[in-house]
């Protein structure tokens, strides 16, 4: 039996199980009825996002099918679907007057575009990259890096997909003029040095990217951004990994809903995987390898549902706890819950809150969350994939 036949059979079994999204009762969480998953961890199984498209050998001529595969709060993200294909042919950048063929020229256009790359390239941006609405940055088929300069800003826009690229060693942007559309060049005060900043935006999906070693955060979701899915990414070698929520006093972030699923939080990470303020974070089927301070934290009464994750604590006695509340007290009623998580090497999760905690997904957003023991397989291919034309992506 071939590798892909086994994958298909296991995926079919995986997707047919009843959904684990019931209301949560009691202080310590619910225990949903056991689904008939394999007792032993299978070696060839794909998560629901990947099984939607990766087995198709015609992915290169049907790239926009990817937009049908997101799950969770960002599942309706269109990106550049139904727009033209725009091909990046060179790595050069001009922040004010970008030239055709450059990445910046594509992302600032007003119309929907599905952006691909003609060849491998390392893009060092002159200033932060302002991405307009209805854009997909699709790195499949090439090795694409954005590195050694300012990186990506998704601000006050909607429907953006970033897939299959590496973003690392990002630096703060300079104060100065940056073009954000064909008709607008605005003065920017200078970006913080995040890999990706999502500011006041909705319907954003970050999938199969590699993120590491930036000046500030790897992903910041702030200023009432919502309908976000962050999936299948590989994070490594960084301090403050992922921030969800601007600050404790920014009450509009109560509307924020973010799904963090199927990611691999690898070695050399310190904290914020994620750190949440006010909003709702569904953290599902992620792998955590030996964080240095804590894995999941928050302040300002966020709701955090940790489901089916795989936590491996470090050998240090002071970093066994998964959770951290960024306050000295008063958090007993915060709704932080764990269900079907796996804890290794002494890792433990401190829950809080009472009563039910429904998962507010629509029928289109729901996906089956596997038990935590399957996570090593479900996250084995996190980060950019090796995609060859006329064949599936590995």
From Swiss-Prot:
EC class name: lyase
Q: Which Pfam families does the UniProt record give? A: Pectate_lyase_4 (PF00544)
Listed GO biological process terms: pectin catabolic process
- Listed cofactors: Ca(2+)
Task: Say yes or no: keyword Iron present.
Answer: no
Give the record's cofactor note, including how many are bound. Binds 1 Ca(2+) ion. Required for its activity.
Query: Which GO molecular function annotation, any one, does this entry have?
Result: metal ion binding
Q: Which SUPFAM superfamilies match?
A: Pectin lyase-like
Residues that coordinate or bind Ca(2+) = 192, 216, 220
UniProt-listed Gene3D superfamilies: Single-stranded right-handed beta-helix, Pectin lyase-like
Q: In which pathway does it act?
A: Glycan metabolism; pectin degradation; 2-dehydro-3-deoxy-D-gluconate from pectin: step 2/5
Q: Which residues form the signal peptide?
A: 1-22
Keywords attached to this Swiss-Prot or TrEMBL record, sorted alphabetically, are: Calcium, Lyase, Metal-binding, Signal
The record places the active site at: 272
What EC number(s) does the entry state? Answer: 4.2.2.2
Q: Which reaction does it catalyse?
A: Eliminative cleavage of (1->4)-alpha-D-galacturonan to give oligosaccharides with 4-deoxy-alpha-D-galact-4-enuronosyl groups at their non-reducing ends
Its family remark reads:
Belongs to the polysaccharide lyase 1 family.
Q: What is this protein called?
A: Putative pectate lyase 17
Q: What is the protein's species of origin? A: Arabidopsis thaliana (Mouse-ear cress)
């Amino acid at each position: 039996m071939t590798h892909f036949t086994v994958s298909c059979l296991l995926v079919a079994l995986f997707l047919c199980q009843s959904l684990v999204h019931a209301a949560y009762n009691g202080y310590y969480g619910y225990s949903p009825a056991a689904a008939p998953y394999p007792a032993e961890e299978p070696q060839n199984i794909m998560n629901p996002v990947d099984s939607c498209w990766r087995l198709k050998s015609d992915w290169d001529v049907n790239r926009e099918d990817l937009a049908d595969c997101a799950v969770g709060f960002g599942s309706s993200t269109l990106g550049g679907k139904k727009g033209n294909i725009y091909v990046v042919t060179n790595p050069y950048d001009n922040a004010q007057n970008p030239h055709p063929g450059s990445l910046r020229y594509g992302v600032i256009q007003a119309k929907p575009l599905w952006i691909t790359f003609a060849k491998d390239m390392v893009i060092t941006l002159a200033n932060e990259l302002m991405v307009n609405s209805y854009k997909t940055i699709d790195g499949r088929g090439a090795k694409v890096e954005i590195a050694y300069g300012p990186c990506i800003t998704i601000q006050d826009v909607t429907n953006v997909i970033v897939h299959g690229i590496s973003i690392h060693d990002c630096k703060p942007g300079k104060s100065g003029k940056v073009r954000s559309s064909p008709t607008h060049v605005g003065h920017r005060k200078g970006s913080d040095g995040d890999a990706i900043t999502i500011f006041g935006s909705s319907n954003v999906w970050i999938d199969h990217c590699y993120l590491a070693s930036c000046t500030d955060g790897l992903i910041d979701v702030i200023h009432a951004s919502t309908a976000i899915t962050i999936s299948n990414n590989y994070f490594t070698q960084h301090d403050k990994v992922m921030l969800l929520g601007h600050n404790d006093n920014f009450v509009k972030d109560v509307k924020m809903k973010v799904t963090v699923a199927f990611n691999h939080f690898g070695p050399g990470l310190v904290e914020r995987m994620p750190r949440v303020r006010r909003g709702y974070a569904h953290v599902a089927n992620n792998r955590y390898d030996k964080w240095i301070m804590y894995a999941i934290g928050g302040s300002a009464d966020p709701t955090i549902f940790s489901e089916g994750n795989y936590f491996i604590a470090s050998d240090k006695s002071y970093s066994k706890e998964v959770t951290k509340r960024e306050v000295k007290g008063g958090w007993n009623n915060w709704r932080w819950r764990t269900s079907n998580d796996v804890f290794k090497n002494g890792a433990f999760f401190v829950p809080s809150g009472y009563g039910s905690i429904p998962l507010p997904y629509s029928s289109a957003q729901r996906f089956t969350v596997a038990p935590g023991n399957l996570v090593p397989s479900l996250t084995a291919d996190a980060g950019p994939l090796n995609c060859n034309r006329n064949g599936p992506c590995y």
